[in-house]
């Protein structure tokens, strides 16, 4: 057993840890950059958020994975936006607590197929504040989504 653990440790030292980096070292810039760009990525979405008219039922699981656009654009005036979408089915257990019944059924969810960085439309106030040096250190409102990240 000790020989096996030593072999695994040596292999990780030679090839790197599964995350793509050697333990204790920083992730390389190109890997960080590639992971952060605007692209489709698997995300969890709440079934009730996607189907708000279904509040009379319970769902198992209560959320599902779908591809959605996410990531950073090169300019803060741009936002990662879905330019292609499709409907996908997921098998969900629908529970009716009043009747004490349940059944497996297919529910439809929107999945993103293509993403692009596009100009932000409409500014919504998020309540975040940013220092405005021109006003003697007073704070000014920052529109939603115009902060880093």
From Swiss-Prot:
GO-annotated molecular function: chemoattractant activity; growth factor activity; toxin activity; vascular endothelial growth factor receptor binding
Summary of the tissues where the protein is detected: Expressed by the venom gland.
Subcellular location: Secreted
Record-linked Gene3D superfamilies: Cystine-knot cytokines
GO cellular component: extracellular space; membrane
Keyword tags: Disulfide bond, Growth factor, Pyrrolidone carboxylic acid, Secreted, Signal, Toxin
Record-listed Pyrrolidone carboxylic acid modification sites: 25
Cysteine-cysteine disulfides: 38-80, 69-115, 73-117
Region Disordered, annotated ranges: 118-149
Any matching Pfam family: PDGF
Region forming the signal peptide: 1-24
GO biological process, one term: vascular endothelial growth factor receptor signaling pathway
Major localisation: secreted
Family statement drawn from the similarity comment of this UniProt entry: Belongs to the PDGF/VEGF growth factor family. Snake venom VEGF subfamily.
Quaternary data: Homodimer; disulfide-linked. Interacts with VEGF receptor-1 (FLT1) with a high affinity, whereas it binds to VEGF receptor-2 (KDR) with a low affinity. Does not bind VEGF receptor-3 (FLT4).
Function according to Swiss-Prot or TrEMBL: Snake venom VEGFs that may contribute to venom dispersion and prey subjugation by inducing vascular permeability and hypotension. This protein induces an increase in capillary permeability after intradermal injection, as well as a drastic hypotensive effect after intravenous injection. The hypotension is mediated by nitric oxide (NO), which is produced by VEGF-activated endothelium NO synthase. Also induces angiogenesis in vitro. Like other crotalid VEGFs, this protein interacts with VEGF receptor-1 (FLT1) with a high affinity, whereas it binds to VEGF receptor-2 (KDR) with a low affinity.
Entry protein name: Snake venom vascular endothelial growth factor toxin 1
């Amino acid at each position: 057993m000790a020989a096996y653990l030593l072999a695994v440790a040596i292999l990780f030292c030679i090839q790197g840890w599964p995350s793509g980096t050697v333990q204790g070292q920083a992730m390389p810039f190109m890997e960080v950059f590639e992971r952060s760009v605007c692209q489709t990525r698997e995300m969890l979405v709440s079934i009730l958020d996607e189907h708000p008219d279904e509040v009379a039922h319970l769902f198992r699981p209560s959320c599902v994975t779908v591809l959605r656009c996410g990531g950073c654009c090169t300019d803060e005036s741009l936002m990662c936006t879905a330019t292609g979408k499709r409907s996908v089915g997921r098998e969900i257990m629908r529970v009716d607590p009043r009747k004490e019944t349940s059944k497996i059924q297919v529910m439809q969810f929107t999945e993103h197929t293509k993403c692009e960085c596009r100009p932000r439309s409409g500014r919504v106030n998020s309540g975040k504040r940013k220092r405005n040096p021109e006003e003697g250190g007073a704070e000014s409102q920052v529109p939603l989504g115009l902060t880093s990240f």
